[in-house]
């Protein structure tokens, strides 16, 4: 039995008083003080961990102003505040103690756009890709690019002055910020925009907080103009935080306070809104993917690409390329970046040309390719091949791979993981190759592996050395390397922070700015935040206050993780290896990961949040001397003793009375998971939440009783076959209003599915497919076996959507094969989802033995529901290991593609069909939609893939009363709109859950693709 974890870091009374008074004064946002909420805000995309006291989620600038006004009260003068955006920072920019002000949950409105003048006004929590999705119909985009664009907020981009691919042409975020609305500590609203210097000087004479800010910045930047110009490196990635260089324009006629706030990392004010310059979308985009025999060759050849008038040049090394090859993302780009025969591709330059004149762009591309051919022929520059990508969809797929490369590095095998701490250094591009050669020599001298990729056109390369932060000695080495890289960048006239901000690296600021200029930064900080209450420890302390700076060797995630025994860390790798990349925060409703995060906007309900909580849970167990591995081994095979039952009942009674246990917070996070498994493939680190969720639930329920619904779900494969013998009787009973009401109130289940009428057994009466014995199958000759297909049943389709199985049997017959309906054998997935892992292992072993016996017949076995078929491949393998055997159950599309391989493709005509894939299917097997389309094409039918996220049903998730609202909300995010615009009778869904959800919400259902094929085939 797991122990009660009754102690968690508490919240000081002053913070609780502040939050209470904040709500009393009309705050309309959310506040959070639970340990789980605070833990999810204690990390970002960096190696650091710092627990805040509380989190607030404002809904408007007025809410932020209320926070700032209340904070200025004398009784709260000791509290500190840190703004936070998407949490994608790689250096702890938004990590701090005190109160986190999260702008991402609610402040995500696009306020107005002026296409004629080319600007848009947004709230700070708008996500970069969200804005570009909005701008696309107007023919515009927000130009600064970054790899985390689908979850990074514009407020975060402004605060770190982010930039990435294309910065040589498009510049940094600050080059596109026309003005901001910021709230000062005290509640004053500061609106910035470029001003004539005379007006700025006049504003500085006002005896107000804003007046003093204008005066300080105006005077310091004017008086120290020459010092600033002399000390700021002449780089595309100029020195930010605070950008004294660009407050005045070159002619000294214009003054813009915005430049001080961009890159300020929340140390000066709360930026709540911004007016942004937007750029016309280029009409033509081309990529030339240039392949090299070494990474050094790729680096040294990059200036040549820039001279060819390319928009951007992105470089990727062999380590990143190889990790991409092992990831599901490679499926989308493999034809665009093919291998060169008899050559090893160890470096890649992704060269983009863009503009409005197609002839001009093609001329530049052709000229480059001709020159590349010359280099290949003469064996120069290490060029071994090239490919041109002319289609926009292909261009976007390659950049998606490049963006995912950041996270893929974290998926390197072993305890040492490539980590960010010196990952955005910038040097003049002409020195980059020599600089990187020295950088690599430094890392090689310590015997470290590393991955490299980046923006070679701008002199920025992302370098992530592999270190084990659970090893104290490697943590010390990280600081040593960091110090050495500071010296190395200085040697080449570069910067340690080229695009990701300073964060915990601010301790190096005096070395880059010089003491005299650093003193000027402190004066600026003092004008905005004299008492050092906004994100203290970052950028610089205010003048007149001897306050400490954050350090590179501050407390890290590894500091906590190393407290968990190594064996536990290894066995719970799924939770331990989350590196915080945050891809699970993807805003796009059409992205399958993560539906619970999308609907709740609560990061507890994301793979990263769940992994964070489980890591802390494991640490707290270790702190109490409890070994979860031993507990798992000691679990009884079946049943529980009376003493255990009494103990669980007592513990559950105390829990219902409000007795605290951190395990309850973890359980709440796990209960929100739909177990769709999108994270297990879409996450670059392959964080498999359903797997460690099941293990957690199994251990959690050693202490607490399971709800009745869990037992009903886990035994569905036992009672469904019995109920299917009299489906009308049971349906009549289930349909009674009183039964449904009692089910919702006492079991917690709603909208219970009805059994199929007629049942599958009734439909198959007299059909030869249902009456073949094993002996008859074994007696078939080779030719007969080659034409026989074994249909594997699953509990949901066979008993609740039997027509699909019956139609598949008929389809197999129609194609000239002999279908044989195998006896139903429980799959066990429902047991796995609910954490009945011992029971699941028994079910899996029994069914695996049966299917292995069938596999020996040498006939294909096929199932129609993706989630259940893929369970044989994934969960069975994890549960049984080698005992699983070698049996293989094919999906319907896999078998059809093979069976129809020799059939010619017919002329496509008529109305389209529309394919809605199951989350588990399209993420684990991304080629499935195309495979289905190819199958339909063989019969002259067009099948279009519909890009949607999760349907919200996910097995029994949508039937649980506590999930009902979220289930319907998830459906509304993408499925409902698609169903409304497409003809329902032409929509097809492979998942039983998906079809059930459509019928529940829309009133009429959709069919399985095999049913459409049965109709199509003449």
From Swiss-Prot:
Positions of the 4Fe-4S ferredoxin-type domain: 662-695
UniProt key word Iron-sulfur: yes
Matches recorded under PROSITE patterns: 4FE4S_FER_1, 4FE4S_FER_2, FAD_PCMH
Temperature sensitivity of activity: Optimum temperature is 45 degrees Celsius.
Database matches in Gene3D superfamilies: 3.30.465.10, 3.30.70.2740, Vanillyl-alcohol Oxidase, Chain A, domain 4
SUPFAM superfamilies linked to this entry: alpha-helical ferredoxin, FAD-binding/transporter-associated domain-like, FAD-linked oxidases, C-terminal domain
Its job: Catalyzes the oxidation of D-2-hydroxyglutarate (D-2-HGA) to 2-oxoglutarate. Appears to be the only D2HGDH in E.coli, providing the way to recycle D-2-HGA produced during L-serine synthesis by SerA, by converting it back to 2-oxoglutarate. The physiological molecule that functions as the primary electron acceptor during D-2-HGA oxidation by YdiJ in E.coli is unknown. Shows strict substrate specificity towards D-2-HGA, since it has no detectable activity on L-2-hydroxyglutarate, L-malate, D-malate, L-lactate, D-lactate, L-tartrate, D-tartrate, L-glycerate, D-glycerate, glutarate, or pyruvate.
Family: In the N-terminal section; belongs to the FAD-binding oxidoreductase/transferase type 4 family.
The protein, known as: D-2-hydroxyglutarate dehydrogenase
């Amino acid at each position: 039995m797991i122990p009660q974890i009754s102690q968690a870091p508490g919240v000081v009374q002053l913070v609780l008083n502040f939050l209470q008074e904040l709500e009393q004064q009309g705050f309309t946002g959310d506040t959070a003080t639970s340990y789980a909420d605070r833990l999810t805000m204690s990390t970002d995309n960096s190696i650091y961990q710092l627990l805040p006291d509380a989190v607030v989620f404002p809904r408007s600038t007025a809410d932020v102003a209320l926070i700032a006004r209340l904070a200025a009260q004398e009784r709260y003068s000791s509290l500190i505040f840190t703004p936070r955006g998407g949490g994608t920072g790689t250096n702890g920019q938004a990590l701090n103690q005190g109160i986190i002000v999260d702008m991402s949950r609610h402040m995500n409105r696009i306020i107005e756009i002026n296409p004629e003048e080319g600007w848009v006004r947004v709230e700070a929590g708008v996500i970069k890709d969200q804005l570009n999705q909005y701008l696309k119909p107007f023919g515009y985009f927000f130009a600064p690019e970054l790899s985390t664009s689908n979850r990074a907020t514009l407020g975060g981009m402004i605060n770190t002055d982010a930039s990435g691919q294309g910065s040589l042409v498009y510049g940094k975020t600050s080059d596109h910020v026309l003005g901001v609305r910021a709230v000062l500590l005290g509640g004053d609203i500061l609106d910035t925009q470029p001003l004539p210097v005379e007006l700025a000087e006049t504003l500085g004479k006002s005896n107000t907080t804003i007046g003093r800010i204008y005066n300080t910045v105006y005077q310091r930047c004017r008086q120290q103009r020459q010092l600033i110009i002399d000390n700021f490196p002449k780089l595309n990635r100029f020195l930010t935080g605070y950008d004294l260089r660009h407050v005045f324009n070159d002619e000294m006629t214009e003054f813009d306070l915005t430049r001080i706030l961009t890159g300020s990392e929340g140390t000066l004010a709360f930026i709540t809104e911004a007016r942004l310059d937007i750029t016309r979308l280029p009409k033509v985009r081309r990529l030339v993917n240039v392949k090299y025999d070494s990474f050094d060759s790729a680096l040294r050849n990059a200036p040549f690409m820039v001279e060819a008038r390319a928009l951007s040049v992105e470089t990727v090394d062999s380590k990143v390329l190889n990790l991409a090859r092992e990831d599901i993302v490679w499926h989308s780009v493999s034809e665009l970046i093919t291998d060169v025969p008899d050559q090893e591709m160890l470096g890649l330059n992704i060269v983009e040309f863009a503009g409005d004149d197609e002839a001009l762009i093609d001329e530049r591309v052709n000229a480059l390719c001709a020159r590349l051919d010359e280099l290949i022929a003469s064996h120069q520059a290490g060029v071994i091949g090239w490919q041109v990508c002319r289609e926009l969809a292909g261009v976007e797929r390659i950049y998606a791979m490049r963006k995912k490369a950041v996270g893929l590095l974290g998926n390197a095998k072993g305890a040492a993981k490539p980590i960010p701490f010196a990952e955005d250094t910038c040097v003049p591009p002409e020195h980059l190759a020599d600089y990187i050669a020295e950088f690599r020599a430094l890392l090689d001298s310590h015997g470290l592996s590393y991955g490299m990729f980046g923006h070679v056109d701008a002199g920025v390369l992302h370098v992530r050395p592999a270190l084990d932060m659970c090893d104290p000695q490697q943590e010390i080495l990280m600081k040593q390397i960091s110090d050495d890289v500071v010296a190395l960048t200085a040697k080449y006239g570069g910067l340690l922070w080229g695009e990701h901000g300073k964060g915990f690296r601010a301790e190096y600021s005096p070395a880059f700015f010089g003491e005299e200029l650093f003193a000027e930064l402190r004066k600026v900080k003092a004008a905005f935040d004299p008492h050092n209450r906004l994100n203290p420890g970052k950028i610089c302390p205010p003048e007149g206050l001897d306050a400490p700076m954050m350090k590179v060797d501050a407390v890290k995630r590894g500091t906590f993780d190393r407290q968990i025994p190594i064996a536990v860390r290894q066995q719970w790798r799924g939770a331990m290896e989350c590196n915080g990349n945050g891809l699970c925060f993807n805003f796009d409703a059409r992205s399958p990961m993560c539906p619970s995060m999308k609907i709740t906007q609560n990061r507890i309900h994301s793979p990263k949040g769940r992994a964070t909580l489980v890591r802390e849970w494991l640490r707290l167990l270790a702190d109490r001397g409890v070994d979860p591995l031993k507990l798992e081994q000691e679990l009884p095979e079946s049943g529980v003793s009376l003493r255990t039952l009494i103990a669980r009942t007592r513990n559950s009674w105390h829990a219902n009375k409000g007795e605290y246990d951190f395990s309850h917070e973890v359980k709440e996070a796990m209960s929100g998971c739909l177990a769709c498994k999108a994270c297990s493939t879409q996450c670059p680190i392959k964080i498999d939440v359903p797997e460690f969720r099941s293990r957690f639930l199994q251990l959690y329920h050693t202490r607490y009783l399971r709800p009745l619904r869990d037992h009903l779900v886990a035994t569905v494969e036992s009672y469904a076959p019995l109920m299917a013998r009299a489906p009308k009787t049971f349906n009549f009973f289930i349909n009674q209003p009183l039964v449904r009401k009692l089910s919702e109130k006492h079991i917690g289940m709603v909208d219970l599915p009805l059994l199929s009428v007629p049942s599958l057994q009734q439909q198959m009466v007299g059909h030869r497919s249902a009456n073949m014995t094993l002996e008859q199958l074994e007696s078939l000759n080779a030719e007969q076996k080659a034409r026989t297909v074994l249909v594997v049943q699953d509990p949901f389709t066979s008993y609740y959507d039997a027509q699909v199985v019956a139609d598949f049997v008929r389809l197999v017959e129609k194609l000239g094969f002999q279908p044989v309906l195998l006896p139903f054998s429980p799959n066990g997935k429902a047991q796995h989802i609910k954490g009945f892992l011992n029971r699941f292992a028994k079910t899996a072993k029994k069914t695996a033995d049966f299917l292995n016996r069938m596999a020996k017949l040498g006939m294909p076995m096929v199932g129609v529901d993706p989630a259940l078929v893929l369970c044989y491949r994934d969960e069975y393998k994890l549960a049984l290991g080698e005992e699983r055997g070698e049996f293989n159950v094919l999906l319907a599309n896999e078998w059809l593609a093979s069976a129809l391989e020799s059939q010619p493709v017919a002329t496509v005509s008529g109305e389209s069909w529309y394919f809605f894939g199951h989350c588990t299917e399209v993420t684990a097997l991304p080629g499935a939609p195309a495979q289905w389309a190819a199958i339909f094409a063989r019969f002259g039918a067009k099948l279009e893939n519909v890009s949607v996220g999760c349907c919200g049903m996910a097995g029994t998730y949508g039937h649980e009363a506590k999930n009902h609202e979220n289930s319907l909300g998830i459906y509304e995010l993408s499925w409902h709109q698609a169903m409304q615009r497409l003809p329902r009778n032409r929509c097809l869904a492979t998942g039983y859950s998906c079809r059930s959800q459509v019928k529940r919400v829309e009133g009429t259902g959709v069919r399985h693709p095999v049913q459409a094929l049965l109709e199509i085939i003449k």
